[in-house]
UniProtKB/Swiss-Prot annotation:
Gene3D superfamilies: Alanine racemase, Lyase, Ornithine Decarboxylase, Chain A, domain 1. The keyword Isomerase applies. The keyword Disulfide bond does not apply. GO terms for molecular function: alanine racemase activity; pyridoxal phosphate binding. Its cofactor is pyridoxal 5'-phosphate. CDD domains: PLPDE_III_AR_proteobact (cd06827). It comes from the Bacteria. Substrate binds at residues 130, 302. GO terms for cellular component: cytosol. Its EC number is 5.1.1.1. It catalyses: L-alanine = D-alanine. GO terms for biological process: D-alanine biosynthetic process. This is Alanine racemase.
Amino acid sequence: MRPLVATVDLTALRHNYLLAKQCAPQRKAFAVVKANAYGHGAPEAVTALREIADGFAVACLEEAEVIRGCAPEARILLLEGCFEPSEYLRAAELGLDIAVQDARQADWLLAADLARPLNVWLKLDSGMHRLGFSVDGLRECHARLKGAAQVGELNLISHFACADERGHALTETQLERYAELLELPFEHCSLANSAAVLTLPQAHMAWIRPGIMLYGATPFAELSARELGLKPVMTLTGALIAVRDVPVGESVGYGASWVAQRPSRIGTVSCGYADGYPRTAPSGTSVVIHGQRVPLAGRVSMDMLAVDLTDLPQAQLGDAVELWGAQMPIDELAQACGTIGYELLTKVTGRVPRRYIG
């Protein structure tokens, strides 16, 4: 079997969820498990959390069906609502909470003959300009849906654009726009994503929505996961499958972009961009062998990457290589590649086996 595995620590996942709850005492928390729990495996993540989680949030009906199979009694929120009229019938059968973000979705809901009322979360476009009603539009929709037979709870939800940039002016603007609607009779309100859970207590409302923090990555550029008390959930581990000596002046990898400046010892690692390791990782990016960092040498290939072992003479064939995890934070790798931890986690491909511990 190819020596590459993503080890998922479910104890760390539970720790991070409980940390989110500690940040917002007396609030409830939707664990955001969309995109296959950010690449970690939604069924396994939900099973690990279902005894402590107040609810789960996903992007679409197909994801909700998976979650319902793992957590028959859990509250499950469709963050983007339904994409066609027939989905409302299935949402009612599954007992979902749904976002309603425009007049078309409201029309579909009011026209539906449902087995049971749906808990509705009216989505405010408070400044991100992606989904949601304007302040006035939401007031109008609230009036339309209040008391409708298809509606159980009527709740309020919005999403921050810049909460991960502390002190950004737009965050205060979004809070103010959200506050304009709190005079309306809502059962529950939700606003805080991971960044706001960690640093904006005024945004916590009745329900928080921790996402990336559940998986042990930071939403901030300037605050590490360790500083925030988060534990990494996924460790991506390959192995040295070849070791060779490369003389001065010889190159390594596609494009001959890395050239040996000294007699070098080069290791080949069983991981590449087809596994989800970023091709954009530059030479010098660290991996960890025997607890010591060694740098990438040359371009990442589809199935392999090369590392410079010259300063780690004890490294040998078969040694484990941590691509990211507790010793090599995923956020550090993401920053080196000009991206974010979210993207790397969700891009770990299906050919990488997941191993669950805890």
